[in-house]
A protein has these predicted regions:
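Cys-dependent protein tyrosine phosphatase-like superfamily
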Residues: 1-139, 152-245
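Ser/Thr-glycine-rich phosphate-binding loops at phosphate-binding pockets of nucleotides
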Residues: 144, 148-149
Length: 245
């Protein structure tokens, strides 16, 4: 099945879970976010295969990998080898045993805050890359397309004035789209994907609500935060145009 005719959010791919377009949300000035500009998803597993043609239809021209250095070494992104794609890798959270131990002892939203406070330089690089991206869609991904990807998606939607409830709803959709993979992994004996044993696999609305509240109360707004870490007003305006115009 190919990408939508231009006005559907979910993108069905053979080798990628949790893939969707950020288009279709009401935003500032009575406008709506545009389809085919920003795609969020998890990492592709295996070779690109038929997904290559589907992504070319959109067309995806820029990919930003948000995973940790260890993750990308163990499982390199298939997008990095695509000749027609500009590939960037900027770590927002390093997933390792120390991180897992830390995140298990605190609410998930607090680990999201670490991406703002402990990875400022990389966060700035993500938005520099988005602003400078050539014409075509920007696809950004982590491992599951839920946490680090969810952070960037929330910030993009916030930049153009999408309502908080819609931002939270966009985050929650991962619960549904990841279920088939989680069930398969648990059936194969991988209990790490059991949501009852690992509640951080869930995309609870409270997690994104608290993250957005922290961002606004601490920095004033997403735009103010990004400006504070070195993303220029001109770059932010360019990003807004990409998503709205």
């Amino acid at each position: 099945m190919s990408h939508n005719s231009g006005n559907a959010r979910r993108i069905l791919l053979d080798g990628v879970f949790n893939c969707r377009d950020l288009g279709g949300y009401p935003c500032a000035g009575g406008k709506t976010t545009k389809f085919g500009r920003f795609i969020r998803c998890g990492i592709p597993f295996g070779p690109m295969g038929p997904d290559r043609a589907r992504l070319a239809e959109i067309p995806v021209k820029t990919v930003i990998d948000l995973r940790g250095n260890g993750e990308s070494k163990v499982a390199p992104s298939a997008y990095a080898k695509e000749p027609d794609i500009v590939y960037h890798h900027y770590t927002l959270l390093e997933i390792n045993p120390a991180y897992v131990e830390k995140v298990e002892s605190q609410p998930l939203w607090e680990s999201y805050v670490c991406s703002l406070t402990e990875h400022k330089e990389n966060m700035a690089q993500v938005f520099h890359a988005i602003a400078a991206a050539p014409e075509g869609a920007v696809l950004f991904h982590c491992a599951l397309g839920k946490d680090r990807t969810g952070i960037v998606a929330a910030m993009l939607l916030s930049l153009v004035g999408v309502d908080r409830l819609d931002i939270i709803a966009d985050y929650q959709i991962s619960n549904t789209y990841l279920q088939p993979m989680f069930r398969t992994m648990v059936e194969d004996g991988n209990d790490i994907f059991d949501e009852e044993k690992n509640p951080h696999l869930k995309s609870d609305p409270e997690t994104m609500e608290k993250f957005c509240t922290y961002l606004d109360e601490t920095y004033g707004s997403t735009r103010a935060y990004l400006e504070s870490i070195g993303v220029t007003s001109e770059e932010l305006d360019a990003i807004v145009r990409k998503l709205m115009d």
